A protein has these predicted regions:
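Fe(II)/2-oxoglutarate oxygenase catalytic core
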Residues: 1-156
Length: 157
């Protein structure tokens, strides 16, 4: 099935800087997060139990004082430009990077183990591009979309 899920990448040194920022950040608390556990049967296999992670909820304004965040948003802007060049129909649309974002850490055995899909409402129906960056290689992780029949490996950058 055709889709518009694009596998761009950012400079991996920025990934290392973001991990260092996550580990050493003292101005914003890290929050443990656990979604309500659920399981579903998909093609004869049980899939998922929810989401368990430790999240750092940040605001883009921090990028004015934190170099690694500025470099990250510069790289995201470059990726958006490349995406729009590949999917030329999107070029006339406004692109804005959301002010709020998360850096999430998954310990062994944790993760987001449910299918990715859009829960549409009035606000999300206007969004046509979402992004995610893996800060480390994770051979046991990745992101999978059921209806697009697409799997993206958890690869750094």
């Amino acid at each position: 099935m055709p889709d518009f899920i694009w596998e761009g990448n950012i400079n991996t040194s920025i990934c290392d800087q973001l991990l260092n920022y996550y580990d050493n950040c003292t101005i914003v608390p890290k929050l443990s997060f656990q979604a309500s556990p659920t399981q579903e049967m998909v093609e004869g296999h049980f899939r998922g139990h929810g989401k368990t992670s430790t999240d750092l909820h940040l605001h883009m304004i921090l990028s004015h004082n934190e170099g690694c965040l500025k470099y990250y948003f510069d790289e995201l802007s470059r990726c958006i430009t490349e995406y729009m060049e590949e999917y030329t129909w999107s070029g006339g649309m406004e692109s804005v990077i959301s002010d709020g974002f998360n850096i999430q850490r998954y310990q062994p055995g944790e993760g987001y183990t449910l299918w990715h899909y859009e829960r549409t409402n009035g606000e999300l129906s206007k969004r046509f591009l979402a992004w995610m960056t893996y800060l480390t290689d994770n051979p046991d992780g990745g992101t999978e979309w059921l209806h697009q029949e697409k799997y993206v490996a958890g690869k750094k950058g």
